[in-house]
A protein has these predicted regions:
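C-terminal substrate-binding/catalytic lobe of Rossmann-fold NAD(P)-dependent oxidoreductases
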Residues: 1-110
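NAD(P)-dependent Rossmann-like dehydrogenase/reductase catalytic/cofactor-binding core
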Residues: 94-97, 101-142
Length: 142
């Protein structure tokens, strides 16, 4: 059974919009967000639809995504138009991102998967603690 919740009023929407505005430096950027509950023990899959600035190519968007995360230990970027699946992140502290081009030239989909019990909770807390205390980022995680 699959259930959608938080349509238009999800508890994290204010935080998501706040961080998008900071990252994009565009005050008119906003997200409409809802979540889906599925019967799995671990894993979150997010579909994030983006409308890039007019004239920005798919390759430019992919390069931006790739360059932003290429040096991050726990974030993997798939090749263009490849889509991640949740089974590839179960029991890991990693996030896998894919960027897919659809039939419309001005809409792309970023697909993100992570293990909500590691990267989404305990693993992320350990990673943040390590970084804040200038320890090796992966101490106690790997």
């Amino acid at each position: 059974n699959i259930k959608t919740y938080g349509v238009g009023d999800h508890k994290h929407i204010a935080e998501i919009n706040q961080e998008i505005k900071k990252a994009s430096k565009m005050n008119n950027s906003e997200v409409f967000f809802s979540a889906n509950l599925i019967p799995v023990e671990r894993g979150i899959l997010s579909n994030i639809y983006v409308n890039p600035i007019k004239g920005t190519s798919f390759d430019e968007v992919y390069s931006c995504l790739y360059n932003a995360y290429k040096s991050e230990k726990y974030i993997n970027i798939l090749d263009q138009n490849e889509i991640p699946i949740t089974k590839d992140v179960v029991n890991t502290n990693k996030v896998i991102l894919g960027l897919k081009k659809g039939y419309k030239e001005d809409v792309y989909c970023i697909v993100s998967v992570l293990d909500n019990l590691l990267k989404g909770a305990a693993g992320q807390a350990m990673q943040n603690f390590n970084i804040m205390n200038k320890f090796n980022e992966s101490l106690g995680i790997d």
